[in-house]
Amino acid sequence: MNKGYPTNLTDNQWQILEKILDPTRRKRINPLRDIVNAMLYLIKTGCQWRMIPKDFPPYNTVYYYFRKWKNEGVLEDMMDTLREKVRVSMGKEDTPSLGIMDSRSVKTSHHVDSDRGIDGNKKIKGRKQQAVVDTLGLPMALAIHEANIHDSVGAVSVVKVMIDRFPRLRKILADGGYQGETLANIVKKDLGCELSVVLRPNESSKKFSVIPKRWIVERSFSWLENFRRVAIDYEFFSESSLAMLQIAFSAIMLKKLL
């Protein structure tokens, strides 16, 4: 294992992930710790799979595990487990009672031709990332769709991810882009909680104003700017983009734990 990269897991961090990714601790030609380190290097630097340094396992082996964990939901489970651990470490219940919803549009690379559109407001051709976070800014659910889909429609995909997972959830805060009875009814039916749309004091004003608690999810999106692989969407398929977000948020939460 190469120990020279700042993105490499510490021993304590690996002890946490090992219980999630490798509970049997089976011997392998390429240790899973090295494979995870390669993924963390890739998402931080934004390099191509083939450009992963040679002192990591072969790039096709790393990609094999990325695809396997993506398809089997392992990366999502990892993100969820880390969120619960961070919450407990900060003296909170393992599941939140309040969620905060928002989205951001991200430009896709020129070679991406699927699951993308043009966000007319932001003038961005790419994909939209939907997120619901807790009051600590930790991700509860993520979804990705074409940037031209309105928030009130695209949010349904992230709501579906949350079904039967947050028994304490009572309210989700959102901005004016999520107005409408249709979405509110879906949230009530599927999650059993209230969707509270918080508007700025004057929606027609272009002056900046901080909306209580809404800044939390915006801060969560800003954390992702430290990871080049997700600052611009290079993935052919939105499922891979989602998996990259899950890895990035997992890396963020690992640092909060240790």
Language model region names:
Residues 1-258:
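Short alpha-helical elements
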